[in-house]
Amino acid sequence: MSKTVVRKNESLDDALRRFKRAVTKAGTLQETRKREFYEKPSVKRKRKSEVARKRKKF
């Protein structure tokens, strides 16, 4: 979990921006979206192979 302490004389917007950057860098939001719904192993394999196919195409 990301934690951000508001510094002295720092606006709330700046602290929020630092927090969002930390969350993005840690991959927390992406991981949460990925785990939001259960995905069967067969569907995971299919999605993984499609991503690899797209990556290989370029």
UniProtKB/Swiss-Prot annotation:
Protein name: Small ribosomal subunit protein bS21
Biased composition annotated in UniProt, kind: Basic residues: 43-58
Cysteines joined through disulfide linkages: none
GO BP terms: translation
A Pfam family the protein falls into: Ribosomal_S21
Start and end residues of each stretch annotated as Disordered: 39-58
GO molecular function: structural constituent of ribosome
Gene: rpsU
GO cellular component, one term: ribosome
Domain of life: Bacteria
Family: Belongs to the bacterial ribosomal protein bS21 family.
Keywords, comma-separated and alphabetical: Ribonucleoprotein, Ribosomal protein
